[in-house]
Structure formats: structure tokens, C-alpha cells
Amino acid sequence: MAVLTVTYNTGETIRPFLASVAGASTAPVAVVIADNGSTDLDALRAIGESYGATVVSSGGNRGYGGGIDAALTALDDVLPDVRPDFLLVTNPDVVLGPGSIDELVRAADRLPGAGAFGPRILDEQGETYPSARQLPSLRTGLGHAAFSRVWPANPWSQRYWSTTQVVEREAGWLSGACFLIRTSLFRQLGGFDESYFMYFEDVDLGQRVGRAGRSNVYVPSAVVTHTGAHSTSSNRRRMEIEHHRSAYRYLSRKYRAWWLWPLRLVLRAGLSVRARWVTRK
């Protein structure tokens, strides 16, 4: 088993995550941390080593997906004897619940046709985060984008979030905050698409898992807690812009036929206006 994560000026906040790994799996776990250009890399190395983790530099700020891909490369280069059947991809501000990795692996053993497995993700208040959702379509995406903030209960957002079923089920995609994936499948897919700097890289991956003939499965019996988006909290405006940029990239690829160019134009304009609206001072 290998656990891959990415840091960017994370500092001491990674300790709870590292401390939770041992209790999440009864099997040996190799932890690889790819750092995206932190100013405190030496301190991070010391923290990682104290928990038996391997810390490597990704070579720059490659975003979340690029950082995870760098961590997998480092796993091959630095720990060549580690040949895991599964990878747990996770944010560094996640605390893994007791036995959570074991529970995801058990689900994978029960469901050989499935490729990726997502736990139930709780926020700091203990509320379930909607981490297993349907793939966004144009109708759902536009409705969600237009009304999610002013009318949270709108039918498009409800369909997008698919929050009502905290039961084991298939989903279109799983949150990149924490999920288990078969190593062979992740390699087959070429890892994350690094053109998504941040946001929608998990949506894209979930779509490609489905296209490869595998399913994404929500496994709520495995529980983790997402303690907060540390690396994004310092620059919310930039992250909102990145979110809208990635949304356009995903939808423009989904509706890429040449005769849909007017639709892509409207999408770009609409998302640009929304980005300016939500980032206004």
C-alpha cells in the first residue's frame, strides 16, 4: 500500500495526517509527500522523516494532480521495492479514520470490476461532505453555476452534489481529497491530467475511470475527516479563478464538436462573469 499526498507551505498542519496513517491500515504503508515549492521544505522533510514518510520536491508548483503524479514517480525512483496494488491519493489536511484504508481495500477486493473507491469525508463539524457525485453535464453545470449560491436547493445543484445517499454506491467521480485507486489503473490512465492545475482534475479522472470500463464506488463505511483547505485559504480569489478556469476546460472538452463553438463561447463568457462576481471585493 502506498499513500501519496502533495504539500505547499503546509508546515506543522501535516502532522495529524501523518499520525493517522498507522491506524488506518493493518498492512505496511509507504507514504510519499511531493512538495510543490514550499518555503519550509527542510522543516517538512524533518517532519516527514519522523513519521517514516518520504519527502520529495515536485520541481515546482505543479498543482494537485501534477504533485500526485510526481509522488508516484518518486515512489518508483526512491522506493523501487515498493510495488503496491493500491494507491491512496489524499490531501495533507485529511485525518484518516481507524481502519479506513483497510475498509477501502476490502471494498476493492469485493468489487473487482471497480477501479476507484472513495470514503465518507467529514468536515470539521462532523458533517458529511458530498464527495461522490455525478459527472457534470451542461444543463446541470449551468444550473449549478448560476443558482448554487443564491438558491442552494435548486434541482441542478441537488443532482450535481448527489448528497442524499450515504450508502455504498457507484458515482461519476470521487473527490480528490481522498480516494483509493488500483495502481495498475492509475498508471494505465496516465495519472492525473496536469492541464488542470487545481479543481476538476478529480472529475476528469473519474470520467476516464468510467471510460476505461471501471466504476467509481463510494464506500461510506470508510471514514476520514477533512480538516480544512490549508493551501488554498491564503488566496481565495486566485483559487476561485482557477476553479472557473478548470470548469471551462472540462466542459469545453466534453462539448468539443466543432459545431458547438457558440456554446463554448457562451460557457466561457458565463463562467468569466461568474468568476468576477464571486471574487468581487
Where are these regions (language model features)?
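Short beta-strand-to-loop acidic/aromatic patch adjacent to the donor-nucleotide binding site
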Residues: 80-95
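Short, flexible, basic/aromatic active-site loop/helix in glycosyltransferases
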Residues: 136-171
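A short, conserved alpha-helix in the catalytic core of glycosyltransferases
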Residues: 164-166, 170-223
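A conserved acidic beta->alpha catalytic loop
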Residues: 20, 33-44, 60
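Active-site-adjacent helix/loop segment of glycosyltransferases
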Residues: 207-281
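Short, acidic, metal-binding catalytic loop of nucleotide-sugar glycosyltransferases
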Residues: 19-28
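Glycine-rich, basic loop-to-helix element that forms the pyrophosphate-binding segment
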Residues: 57-78
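Conserved donor NDP-sugar-binding/catalytic core segment of glycosyltransferases
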Residues: 95-130
